[in-house]
């Protein structure tokens, strides 16, 4: 799989991913649940580029070579000690990670069906493949940009970052504003990503809540952030007792694993209506809050606060996390809307780690099957729905009382 025109010695010097911690925290929190509750689950992930007109085929060899080197990595003793120090990580999980590597036999990279497209499929045990998604997307991004943007305008990026931070730092009314960096998968490069985190830590003070990237959290002494992702609730469509109960099943298993820790529920795998039907008084009181990742965030927040009141949970004690394509101005609008009514937190990704004046890639890698059965995400944004089985998608919509596409 190594690119023919780059020697192994040269290639190791330019590896994009050099640590298995260079990923998002929620991958580890989900992986621990998989180890303890679903160790035999088999899954399939599929890559998709939503940005039209992107030709990645000239870089296939580079991507394959980077992924090959990714699959040689192991966790170091220092990294394992860091994970062991996180309050919600259990010792048997760290012991498992001490033996872990990403299995190269489970990832398939080739040409896609459309001109310029590439195909990336991951297929195998969920426990052993869950850590592919984030570094593979980061590899695709960085390979593309280092070939198409050979002379990045770093100063422009720094000016843009400073202007964003100033929106918060220059406004005394935003004393309680907290923002986290969530941009690993779509970053321009790992070097730029690290500069973003170090700059925000140095200049934003208490306004900088932390980062989703575990490696950068460890290096810079900031808080690693994250709970659950869409794939967890999707997989439970195949792992739970029946489809209609899959969302409740997922939340109950999560609560059983973490006993009140990591208590931010993801709301948009089936859309907000279905989420609120399942998020009853028990879950309202048990979970610390919920995360918005599609649809109108203002409407979502108002509906959730009303739902808490209806279920006799004090909204002021709950946290609303916003993470859908956020910018600083949008986050500030939301902070003002919900000030004093609940706790709010913001995760900003691409707008932080890939804003140097050119169009970022809109790429994803989503779970499409679990234990041989189709799974789907039907979010509050129709363009984010991803499923390779129209019949299953229609059935899921019927079961969860969702409108037709």
Swiss-Prot record:
Transiently phosphorylated on a His residue during the reaction cycle. Phosphorylation strongly increases the affinity for substrates and increases the rate of nicotinate D-ribonucleotide production. Dephosphorylation regenerates the low-affinity form of the enzyme, leading to product release. Gene3D superfamilies: nicotinate phosphoribosyltransferase. GO terms for molecular function: nicotinate phosphoribosyltransferase activity. It comes from the Bacteria. The keyword ATP-binding does not apply. Belongs to the NAPRTase family. GO terms for cellular component: cytosol. InterPro entries: N/Namide_PRibTrfase, NAPRTase_N, Nic_PRibTrfase, Nic_PRibTrfase-Fam, Nicotinate_pribotase-like_C. GO terms for biological process: NAD biosynthetic process via the salvage pathway. The keyword ATP-binding does not apply. The modification Phosphohistidine is found at residue 230. CDD domains: PncB_like (cd01401). This is Nicotinate phosphoribosyltransferase. Catalyzes the synthesis of beta-nicotinate D-ribonucleotide from nicotinate and 5-phospho-D-ribose 1-phosphate at the expense of ATP. It comes from Bordetella pertussis (strain Tohama I / ATCC BAA-589 / NCTC 13251). Its EC number is 6.3.4.21.
